Amino acid sequence: MKKIAILGSTGSIGTQTLEVVRENGDIEVLGLAAGSNISLLEEQIREFQPKLVAVWDEKKAAELKIKVQDLDVKIVTGMDGLIEVSVMEEVEILLTAVVGMIGIRPTVEAIKAGKDIALANKETLVTAGHIIMPLAKEMGVSILPVDSEHSAIFQSLQGNKMNSIHKILLTASGGPFRGKKQEDLLNIQVEDALKHPNWAMGRKITIDSSTMVNKGLEVIEATWLFGVEVDKVQVVVQPQSVIHSMVEYEDGAIIAQLGTPDMKLPIQYALYYPKRRYLPGDRLDFWRMGKLDFEKPDMDTFYGLALAYEAGRTGGSLPTVFNAANEMAVGQFLNREIKYLEIIEIIEDCMRAHKNIENPTLDQILETEAETYARIKSRR
């Protein structure tokens, strides 16, 4: 029986991971970690019986201890708690699905402890790929992508040598505002931006998809996962979200992974790699589908994608600024403190003001994040 721990168990990826566990019946969940949703976390604890649970919020952790005092489970808190879950001795795979740079330290410690990583926390590689990937190689652990696009690329690379890649074709749905111009986005409200046409996701990533910043983060993530230069990653808008990504090889052949927009497929693939398992759910019906569309992304309207390429080309600490500025700006937009188009304005302002650090340490990455947050707060 495979033994796993999940960081971010109450979020979109975490809950779908537990659905995969439930459907298969041969995975033991030893550890869970969540932010503050202790009502759902209690349900998960009672069903999956983990030995160790981390809650980021200390007050909520105290409440949870009372709720589950009839169970044999240890409750821990904060960053130390996340790390304790991540390095549990019996755990074979750590699935990290927390949102933001909070996932970096637990991922580093899990790799040092020899755990394979099922990675749904793209910010870890965006900001610290130069630390994570060499460490994973040194420790002999696998980084298994859970993002649908990176899983598709990973699957399309099976049986082929990495040095034969001509380019990666990273697909995007285009989000809810595909085809719009900047002037059409002046009065976008939170509710408008949360209406993704194809995927059911968390609030932050749904906003990121609407601005195409999410795709920019995925471009940078792909460079670290697959060892390619940023300009070898080409974004292609594929509105139906049927082709999840493609790899073009030196001989001109293109291999793609297709499927319905269901995150359980890449989650299950990562948990059972290299084996495949039956997965219940809808299947593609090519007779009914009719056609697939492809478009070039509009980087003038969705300027955040252009900024991501700039951050990826520059490297160093600039991707951290890009990511941190976006995190805070999206939070402000969701709280109705700023307008939609200000998200990208804030990202660009922070990038232009930053003095780049070429090869930042983990501490410097976290300092850069804090400095970026402070700059945005000072705008008010």
Language-model segment annotations:
Residues 1-380:
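Catalytic, metal-anchored helix/loop core of enzyme active sites in primary metabolism
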